[in-house]
Regions:
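Basic, amphipathic alpha-helical hairpins
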Residues: 21-33, 53, 57, 74-83, ...
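Short amphipathic alpha-helical segments, especially helix-boundary/capping motifs
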Residues: 1, 11-13, 47-50, 61-64, ...
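Membrane-proximal linker segments that couple transmembrane helices to downstream signaling/catalytic modules
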Residues: 1-43, 52-55
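Non-catalytic, surface-exposed connector residues within folded enzymatic/regulatory domains
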Residues: 14, 32-33, 64-67, 114
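…primarily DNA-binding HTH/wHTH and HhH modules…
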Residues: 7, 101-122
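Basic/polar phosphate-binding segments, predominantly the helix-turn-helix DNA-binding elements
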Residues: 35-64, 88-110
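Arginine residue identity/basic-tract feature
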Residues: 12, 46, 69, 97, ...
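Terminal helix-turn-helix DNA-binding modules in bacterial transcription factors
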Residues: 55-94, 116-122
Length: 122
């Protein structure tokens, strides 16, 4: 009985994680993405979403979204010749300046320095 209950809980957690990740994947590039939008899309309250995300993902919603944006930004910096403004827009930041500041916090270098390093093969 206990194992069955645990298995059902794990299925629900995995279902939540899948739906959450799918929604973020589809919408991370929107600079106006909000927790309320995600909660509505997943048919739960904002509070429930925060709790489930923390339990299931071991991180906050904002942190998860920013990590996704940074991962995609790194990919674009390595694989494209897009400008910083274009990359910022594609990964969900309203300005290149804000994107640059957040990128530097996450990586320790500016997006331009990151791109130059990658082009040199370092």
């Amino acid at each position: 009985m206990l194992l069955e209950l645990q298995a059902n809980l794990e299925k629900r957690d995995q279902s939540f994680i899948n739906k959450f990740e799918e929604y973020v994947e589809a919408h991370y590039s929107e600079s106006d993405l909000t927790v309320d939008q995600i909660a509505t899309a997943l048919a739960m309250s904002r509070a429930t979403l925060y709790i489930k995300a923390k339990e299931s993902l071991s991180k906050g919603i904002g942190e998860y979204i920013e990590e996704k944006r940074m991962k995609e930004a790194k990919k674009l910096l390595k694989e494209s010749k897009l400008s910083m403004a274009e990359i910022a827009e594609q990964v969900g930041y309203s300005t290149a300046r804000y994107f640059s500041a957040r990128f530097k916090i996450h990586t320790g270098v500016s997006p331009l320095a990151y791109r130059k390093k990658r082009l040199k093969g370092l």
